[in-house]
């Protein structure tokens, strides 16, 4: 199944009703997204061997929350939605969408917010990034979007990505349209921006029992049926792994066909699970999956592959 975003004026009344039944896309609702993530990261940091890094990630998430309200984004995306729909492309495609300098503003505001909380090597990284030219910032952004992770140091990548993510999430939240699921090209990437998922979540509430993949860039979620590999769409050789028991709120779904895995979080097991935070806090499960010979099909925005990985 592929997912297309249809401009509001092109949706018939029957399509509008259908789109409301099982939403193929859940556009980001940015109110409290970053505060909730920061709180969850701090909570998970307790008694976790990665506690210090989880608390560092929480500081970045909190800075995103502050900067989000200090620098709102206003733009009309109607024409872009129509063009993308005609071309069958994501409307905010990371590979073709021109980047506005707004994300530079977001980055420098985040740096200003973070500096008083930093010391030692972390402060040196932030100060070095603060001095980077616009060209250097754009080169790092392009490298990350091209998955050329060796070209961006692993200590700078999460900060660059955090600013880009906030920019893309602001744009995604302004999209004027609804989504329609269609048979066609497989869509293991975000239908809004083309980036990768960070994890998937089986939700509660109005989308009870439905699984949505969570974009690691624009914070959009898109529906993928359960018991199907989100990477290759096969279902014959899926297995579920956890570090606890069958009732664990965080599991890894592995696929023997393509040799990859993706975390799957269950809100019914723990309503507080958060797509980015719980994925980052369960790296021991990633190590286990690597031992079993599976490759990760997602990237956490706070942990990028380094050179040689």
Curated annotation (Swiss-Prot):
Domain of life: Bacteria
SUPFAM superfamilies: FdhE-like
Keyword Cytoplasm: yes
Matches recorded under InterPro entries: FdhE-like_sf (IPR024064), FdhE_C (IPR056796), FdhE_central (IPR056797), FdhE_N (IPR056774), Formate_DH_accessory (IPR006452)
Pfam family, any one: FdhE_C
Single Gene Ontology BP annotation: protein maturation
Sorted UniProt keywords: Cytoplasm
Cell location: Cytoplasm
Cellular component per GO, a single term: cytosol
Any one Gene Ontology molecular-function term assigned to this protein's record: ferric iron binding
Family according to the record: Belongs to the FdhE family.
Protein function: Necessary for formate dehydrogenase activity.
UniProt name for this protein: Protein FdhE
């Amino acid at each position: 199944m592929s997912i297309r975003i249809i401009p509001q004026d092109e949706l018939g009344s029957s399509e509008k009703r259908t789109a409301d039944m099982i939403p193929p896309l859940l556009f980001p609702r940015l109110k409290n997204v970053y505060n909730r993530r920061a709180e969850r990261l701090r909570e998970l940091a307790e008694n976790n061997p990665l506690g210090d890094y989880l608390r560092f990630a929480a500081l970045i998430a909190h800075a995103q929350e502050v900067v989000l309200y200090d620098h709102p984004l206003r733009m009309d995306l109607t024409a872009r939605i129509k063009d993308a729909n005609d071309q069958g492309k994501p409307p905010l495609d990371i590979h073709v969408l021109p980047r506005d300098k707004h994300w530079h503003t977001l980055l420098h505001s985040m740096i200003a917010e973070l500096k008083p909380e930093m010391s030692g090597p972390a402060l040196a990284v932030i100060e070095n990034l603060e001095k980077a030219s616009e060209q250097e910032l754009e080169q790092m952004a392009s490298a990350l979007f091209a998955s050329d992770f060796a070209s961006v140091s692993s200590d700078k990548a999460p900060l660059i990505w955090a600013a880009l993510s906030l920019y893309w999430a602001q744009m995604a939240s302004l999209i004027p349209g609804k989504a329609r699921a269609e048979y066609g090209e497989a869509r293991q990437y975000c239908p809004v921006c083309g980036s990768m998922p960070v994890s998937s979540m089986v939700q509660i509430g109005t989308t009870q029992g439905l699984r949505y993949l969570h974009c690691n860039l624009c914070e959009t979620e898109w529906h993928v049926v359960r018991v199907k590999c989100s990477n290759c769409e096969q279902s014959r050789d899926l297995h579920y792994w956890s570090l606890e028991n069958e009732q664990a709120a965080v599991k890894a779904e592995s696929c023997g066909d393509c040799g990859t895995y993706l975390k799957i979080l269950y809100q019914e097991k723990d309503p507080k699970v958060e797509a980015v935070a719980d994925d980052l806090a369960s790296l021991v499960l990633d190590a286990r999956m690597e031992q079993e010979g599976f490759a990760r099909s997602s990237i956490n925005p706070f942990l990028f592959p380094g050179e040689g990985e």
